[in-house]
Amino acid sequence: MKTQRLFSILLFLLFISVHTYAQPQLTEPIPSLKPGKYQKDQIKRKYGMFIHFGINTFHNEEWTDGSKPAASYMPSRIDARQWVETAKKAGMKYIILVTKHHEGFCLWDSKYTEYDVANSGNQTNVVEEVAKECKRQGIELGLYYSLWDRTQNADVKDLSKDEAYNKYMLGQINELIDMVQKHTKIVEFWFDGGWEKSNQRWPIQQLYSTIKAKAPQCQVGINWSIGLPDNPDYHPVLPENQKEGFPIRYFPSAFRLGDPYLPATPDPKLFTHNGKTYYMPWESTVCISGKWFYHTEDTTYKTVDELAGLYVKATAQDNILILNTPPNRDGQLRERDVKLLTDLAKKLNLK
């Protein structure tokens, strides 16, 4: 009888270990006045492609609220090969792919939600296809993930829902890391939407530790990264207003974000948390046209000269640029975008 009971307990423990993720050891960046090893790698990458693609692509909207049915996402194809090939030929060293935007629609088959590609008009696992292509073509991959989720956590004022939603997020981050790293390393996590709650309500420490435990090379950044000395959670502190020693709004993190702004000149690099100083480069995000997501009426394009000027300013001072190039409803980058990137690479002599 005791043996049978012990066996039942062992089975239960095995079930728990299989169906939950172990809590990682808490880790933090090392205080430093200079860039660390992986920050140097990030600075060396210098230039990448930002890819906004998802359910918003099919509604001519930048932000939707989670009410659009998954079936309305229906690209005729997913030409991940073209996306990666275009980035590589443009002299870009990596891609940042939007995996889930504010509405909560996931570009992979997630076991945590039905609001994903598996229940849509095209069931291709976009995240995995891009990961495979990045590996095949020799370009690095980072992932964008919105903390704010208007499907799973629409009522952000209800603090009682934080614990369940934080578990949901951590589960999805584990899911993404495990899936992508079967094919290629993840070099960056780009988090967004933190302004919808006070910074202390987000599980930044757990997210950072989870990522670093499985992907130590991965750099973690949260949009609108810096606060004010008298209000560390102030939103937003523009680049020109950031001063050396200002508090890190979302700690731990490794680099600064504040889209769509470019860094100040001179650009401060040293910021603080609990009396310690950390080096943090700036990553700029710039749209090649007028929108983040593809819109049928988006006909405003920057010129090659404009883009060249933005590139020079954004990548000076050991900073980084990702240029947003959104695929259309056929799952391809627009011909005009491809030509602009090609012409820009020639002008800047990028390889």
Which positions does each model-derived feature cover?
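Bacterial Sec-dependent N-terminal signal peptides
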Residues: 1-24
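Mature catalytic domains of secreted/periplasmic carbohydrate-active enzymes
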Residues: 23-351
